[in-house]
Regions:
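Cytosolic, long alpha-helical scaffolding segments
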Residues: 1-150
Length: 150
């Protein structure tokens, strides 16, 4: 098959798509004139997700399990940002029901960012599997660190 390994092409295509989504979400959060509740948290989560994507692509290209493990660790940060945004938006909507529509749009953006982080984490777990031959999808970060040291 011309053009390289089919699995790699599939993964790179999927991550390229996710990176575009993350950039769009980041741009949306930076729009001038939009009063976005939790703007800084959304921006921070988008930056983290983009960083995770870059690192996961690099880890894949280099088969770098150390960098892949860093991405897995970062996923907790993106998840926490999402939970904080969600808690705030729920409170915001309860206090003023007129904000429900805007809050839901923001929540969808935040969830998209969180899912991008999840995809980068999955990619990084796959890198560890390719190099070490062990499925680390359902183990702790500490166990992954121990696996890498072997």
């Amino acid at each position: 098959m011309a053009g390289g390994h089919p699995e790699r092409r599939l993964i790179v295509t999927r991550l390229t798509e996710a990176e575009k989504i993350a950039r769009m979400a980041k741009l949306l959060s930076q729009k001038q004139g939009l009063a976005l509740p939790r703007y800084q948290e959304i921006k921070h989560a988008a930056e983290l997700a983009l960083d995770m994507l870059r690192k996961s692509l690099d880890a894949f290209a280099r088969l770098d399990v150390v960098m892949a493990a860093q991405v897995v660790r970062q996923d907790d940060q993106v998840d926490e940002e999402f939970r904080a945004i969600m808690r705030y938006l729920i409170t915001f909507m309860m206090e003023d029901p007129r904000t429900i529509s805007t809050s839901l749009e923001i929540l969808f953006v935040a969830k998209a960012i969180e899912r991008i982080g999840d995809h980068a984490k999955n990619m990084s777990e796959y890198v560890i599997y390719m190099v070490k031959g062990r499925d680390v999808r359902h183990v702790t970060v500490d166990e992954i660190d121990r696996e890498i040291e072997l």
